[in-house]
A protein has these predicted regions:
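Bacterial N-terminal signal peptides that target proteins for export
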Residues: 2-17
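Bacterial N-terminal signal peptides
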Residues: 15-25
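Extracellular/lumen-exposed scaffold segments
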Residues: 28-190
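N-terminal targeting and processing segments of secreted/endomembrane and organelle-targeted proteins
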Residues: 2-3, 26-29
Length: 190
């Protein structure tokens, strides 16, 4: 009843309430797109010896109509795409690989920007401790990025991930795996 009384007293209340509902509804829809960027992780070996280096890859799929900024940007006000890893005593990330970005012009920028779109593969070299005991381990990381369309950008986001790997004794032979993915990474040029 109070709501009806307020409406009768002030005809401007209805448009304001409807406007607020629509504004909040549209805001939630645009920010709720959690599926703009998806990732999948890979390791290069089925087992790792203590003190050995192996590669990891992060396959990043960006939805059509969207892009993310490259890892190195000429515009200091944009958010770069970045792989980050949690520091620990068992592993050390020694080198990163980011693909060559595309140069594109968008409505929200005065100049061309370095961007990634579609599907890209990021990578890193990981060195294990020489003291690493045989067993299963997890490397924790995150992908930081900012998704944009042709007109504007969403708030920066991060996707946390874990990469499981197995340490084996020096006497055990290991095999390379996921070579289809790793053949697309050129660590030599980085």
């Amino acid at each position: 009843m109070i709501f009806q009384t307020d409406i009768k007293r002030n005809n401007k209340t209805i448009p304001v309430i409807v406007g607020m509902i629509l504004l909040l509804g549209f805001t939630n829809v645009s920010e709720g797109k959690s599926d703009i960027v998806e990732i999948k992780t890979f390791i290069s070996k089925d087992g790792v010896h203590p003190g050995e280096t192996f590669k990891i890859a992060v396959l990043v799929k960006i939805s059509p109509g969207w892009h993310i900024h490259a890892s190195e940007l000429s515009d200091q006000f944009l958010i770069p795409t970045e792989l980050l890893f949690e520091e620990n005593e068992k592993t050390e990330v020694t080198q990163f690989h980011y693909p060559e970005p595309k140069l594109e012009k968008y409505e929200y920028s005065a100049s061309e920007l370095e961007v990634y779109d579609g599907e890209i593969i990021l990578g890193a070299w990981v060195k294990t401790s020489s003291e690493l005991k045989p067993g299963k381990y997890t490397l924790k990381g995150e992908l930081d990025y900012q998704a944009c369309d042709n007109r504007s950008c969403l708030s920066p986001k991060k996707i946390e991930f874990e990469i499981a790997f197995k340490s084996v004794p020096l006497s055990k032979k290991t095999e390379f795996i996921n070579q289809k993915i790793f053949s697309k990474l050129d660590f030599k040029k980085d």
